[in-house]
Amino acid sequence: MKYYLEKKETVLRDVHSSADGLSAQEAQRRLDENGRNRLSAPPGKPLILRFFEQMADPMIIILLIAAAISGVLAVVEGESFADVVIILTVVLINAILGVYQESKAEKAIEALQEMSAASSRVLRGGKLVTVPSEELVVGDIVLLEAGDAVPADGRLIQSASLKIEEAALTGESVPVSKFIQLLELGEAKDIPLGDRRNMVYMGSTVAYGRGSAVITATGMDTEMGKIADALSRAEDGQTPLQIKLSQLSKILTWLVLGVCALVFAVQLMRSGRMDFEVVLNSFMIAVSLAVAAIPEGLAAVVTVVLSIGVTNMSKRNAIIRRLTAVETLGCAQVICSDKTGTLTQNKMTVVDHFGDDEKKLAAAMALCSDAEVNAAGDVTGEPTEAALVAWAWKLGLDKNTLKARYIRCCEAPFDSARKLMSTVHLTEDGCIQYTKGAPDVLLSKCTSYVENGRVLPMTAAYRERVEQANKAMAARALRVLACAERRWDAKPVSDEPEFLERELCFTGLCGMIDPVRPEVAAAIKECREAGIRPIMITGDHIDTAAAIARELGILTDGTYAVTGAQLSQLSDEEFSEVFKNISVYARVQPEHKTRIVNAWRAAGYVTAMTGDGVNDAPSIKSADIGVGMGITGTDVTKSAADMVLADDNFATIVAAVEEGRRIYDNIRKCIQFLLGSNMSEVISIFAATLMGFTILQPVHLLWINLVTDCFPALALGMEKAEPDIMKRRPRDAKAGIFAGGMGVDVIYQGLVVSGLVLLSYFVGHFMETGTWMLTDSAHGTTMAFLTMSMAEIFHSFNMRSQRGSIFALPSSNMALLISAAASLAATTVVCEVPALAAAFDFTGVSFREYAAAILIGAFVIPIVELVKAAQRLAARSRASETETD
């Protein structure tokens, strides 16, 4: 039953209750039968399960297989388990980093529970009792007054100037006036939650007045429960980076298996026999190639680079809760933003007025309100009245001083039916009454007006001026209040509205609005320059939403605004045809937000969703990246979000997008560097195998992959953003990891380094034997190891820019210089410390040989620079041809 469409008597009958409430026995029976009034939460994942989930990554699985094979070979050959220990250490470190960043349990449901009131005042058998809110049942009569949290969903049966703050549920920035009358459905199929004026909902707060309601839904059956259910069922999809790394892992897996099988077959054919020793030797060479092809440090490097991004973002007030969200921001194409508290300040403010004397008008409005102000100017109270008191304060009028001078002696509280409020105050010569409320209602009760300090009879011309001023303010989406006064010789004999609110003297209008955050317009402009589409989704009225959207540049030519009711009337097919033209959604419900986000995602757009209310949580979790507000945001939203804005500043999102783009650029540099290194190792080992000698052992490759390469790779992750990073269109989230020519770069750079390494092996072999014979040589292996290490160190500087010359970059990367020095020192230590050199089967290296290795390795810089220059020239040529065409 839709209780908001039924009379209160019908509702009471349907829930088998009465105006006196339930008996204690019946309440207990219902509690036992239906359960407690709380939100259920799914069990969280144990820490050990989260740890093992890190092992599901294909790259990690490859490493574990490599460790297992190395362990078996170590047992068979009686050698050390150094390879196994090194690989498992890498896996363990990566898993710990992943768990550390992502092990925060999902607390959205717990936060929802915390929003519930701890206890409630209810009628049981006609007697007022206080019971824990968890023990409320359908049929209970709950009493509400200002400051109370609504403990469950209910149909109002009494209301006295009751206003409910529902921003967390609906996005409506102004408390909603409530009444007990049934609602008329009209032509609409249903009434949006924000317009159900005779209902109260769990999670909202009483802002003003008092009332009572019969409970119609508890626990998971409430509107809050529906949100909790949607939140628990929402699934986290993979981020673009996760998808790309997963694809890369699969490519590497098949590549490793294919090349290893080829090398194994070539070795067997070269040997000409099939005994155990030959098979084992061939298998060992194949394993060496597998170790060479697998970038053991890649998973850890990406995790650490993302972690560094998390730290950098936190310094810019963007708190990342989900590690991979750092990168996802970089390819965001759509930002669906809540209005209240996100684009606006969530603080009603008077911005315009019409009347004879602004100070006198503000004083009257402040006196005819129940909001209060302290000595510091901080205002508390219902938002609309708080705006009036704050307006007076800005004009130098302290309400406390006004109250002391004009003592209130009687009043007619605000009532949603008559839309007015009146207060009467003592003066030296009698009393003065101030009445404020809806302009059309108040104007009809005025027989005079004030102009230039004189009271004049109301005329049609002046009435027209007031109506035009009202229309002008309303057209700007301002909430307009009118004010009038009346003089009394003595205290009125009655405080009934019918007696007080007549023969009034009109004094003016004021227009207020929840103003936009001052930095948001610039942030949205920057978003558009970066190719990001901003969308406003709000529970507020469509006129208000559209006006603010136009002011901010969200609603532009060719786009329009719709309401949630209009959206509900569209089928999925119809919506899919028009959603790209809609920039503003007003009066929406939670399921609408999720539908909007899903429509953009289904069309292939990487979508972010910002918000602060409970109503935003399901859509935040459904989006590619959910952005919660740290100050005004509810715990529910913050728990569901991937990122939380510590300063609630929309502009922080732009900074986070820039950081996300920088991080992704740097991750690509890391991947290209590490894969290029592995490519050179694969080519070197494959070529050496074909020529009949062993160039490097598995332990050498592990050292290069995990020590020599990882330090520079991490430093590349700290590279500064390129100047045009926020002028680019968002990258295609579906583009492969090798897009933009990176695959070709990896291959040619691998060939260059492998050529230098093979040359160094021959030089070392010649220095040891005096011949160029192609045989195994410990000295040649040592030289090859040194040269590969040096070449990778030098090559890391090439990777600072994919196409730009390293000699033209605007700034240096101090971290890269330090990491290069650290890698050089580590390489020297492993060659010079006798115990390590013996473990790696290295021979002594002279200064001349060090110089030769450094010189040969350094050749990678001029070679890559020449290729980059050719690539830039080709790109310019293609661009000029395109312009000519």
Tell where the protein language model's regions lie, with residue ranges.
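Membrane-interface interhelical connector segments
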Residues: 769-772
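Outer-pore turret/helix-boundary of cation channels
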Residues: 278, 774-775
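Generic alpha-helical transmembrane segments
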Residues: 708, 781-796
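A C-terminal functional module that forms or caps the active site or interfaces directly
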Residues: 799
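Conserved cytosolic headpiece of P-type ATPases
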Residues: 1-730, 737-738, 751, 766, ...
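Core segments of transmembrane alpha-helices
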Residues: 680-681, 745-757
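Membrane-water interface at loop-to-transmembrane-helix junctions
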Residues: 732-751, 775-783
